[in-house]
Amino acid sequence: MSNLYVDVHVLQTVPPSCLNRDDTGSPKTAVYGGARRARVSSPSWKRAMRRNFSEYFDRKYLGLRTLRAVQLIADRIMEMDPEKNRDEAEAWAAKAFGLIGKDDPEKKKKTDAAGTEEPGKEEADVSDTKGNKKPGGKKKAEEKEKDVLFFISCAQADAMADLFFKKKGAVPSKTAVMKIMKENISIDIALFGRMVAKETSLDCEAAAQVAHAISTHKVATEYDYFTAVDDYPAEDGHGSAHIGTTEFNSSTLYRYASLNVKELAANLGESGLLIEEVVIGFVSAFILSMPTGKQNSFANRTVPDMAYVTVRSDQPVNLCGAFEEPVKAGDDGYVQNSIESLAKYAGRVYADFADAPCKAYVVGTDFDGAQRKNLEGMLGALREDVKAALS
């Protein structure tokens, strides 16, 4: 199929909140156009989207990013046969999953028998930065390597559990494990990608890109001074049991994501999934999801003020340049001026640098060159556009 990109541009006002904070507890920010902006990181919003995917896709088509892949596989084994010994299931899962990034045991036996590998190589000493010998360095490094997040699909976990029963508890070949991990790619792995440093053949190039959301205007961090009152104080107590501060800001955010439909179709391969439905789920989740940082303290869940969705055949086009000069608040706030800045900048980009979109839709306002629809109507039209492009 030809190149096909779906770009999603969202303007969304968020009241006092702390959606995404740094290591000091402050709301994340960025300097753009020489001005301090509110920022919500790309990983934070992608996490919110992945949690939202369960509303659009069956769990069996999704994945889990976890440190506990071994325990997950063992859980699947126990679900298939509750009579199995849990320790046995977990030990097998550890050995099978541990083959990723290592030589196949059968090949290693042949290599050792031929005398081409040094005895005791796995336990070879290593030198520290001062040149001092430290025993068992490679083994320690391998143990450390296990403490990394691994993106595994539910279908892959189930297939590994099936392999346990097919092998009757015997350790499988690395080839069998790798075949499972290369197939059965989940929707979220296909969208957001997977990197396996110790086994690059399992890498999956992300079909989607999600930008860091930034405010269209300058932002200053504010502080909420609060006290927590003791409901059962001592007779001589003063009532206040805790005093603290919470940092927050409020902003109108510009959010952007792009989906490479051709890459998505290649990643999902022969999964049997309808690509247009995956596209619709992605766009819906991006528009409606929100990170949950301190949401119980601020109740800041809002919906977008505007969503502008385009279908392109040339390249993705981020329109963040519309806000390089910070938007100034009007009598009606930041939203209307932000919409006008976005429309003006988009027109300039389409006239001077990139083609106008093949199709364009807008929800929540009017926008030059775009059909105005409600969310359901926009998704329906987009579904037909993608389906036609795939046929």
Language-model region placement:
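Basic polyanion-binding and macromolecular-assembly surfaces
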Residues: M1-R39, W45-S391
